[in-house]
């Protein structure tokens, strides 16, 4: 098997509540994540959803990361539509090249055995 070095995440956010500090403006959570704004809006890359036990649930790629990740939480046809409540952590790697995104996504799905990916699965 070929060996591909997976890039380190540029952004990692976890589901959490905002601390009750009166000095800070209240942040409206997006699907339980108050740090969603840290995910790049106009960058392409790959993203990984994990549960609270750090098990990989889903891997995806996008030309616009934040928009695509939000769509997974709102879309009625997303492969994780019945499992959204399991997502506790999101990792994002900025990858500009579309071909590299495709390679990383397929490699991660099949070497780390993501639980809810349907396409590009060769290990089942």
From Swiss-Prot:
Domain GIY-YIG: 42-118
Pfam short name (any one): GIY-YIG
GO biological process: nucleotide-excision repair
Alphabetical list of InterPro entries matching this protein: GIY-YIG_endonuc, GIY-YIG_endonuc_sf, GIY-YIG_UvrC_Cho, UCP026568_excinuclease, UvrABC_protein_C
PROSITE patterns the UniProt entry points to: GIY_YIG (PS50164)
Name this polypeptide is given: Uncharacterized protein YurQ
Species, as recorded: Bacillus subtilis (strain 168)
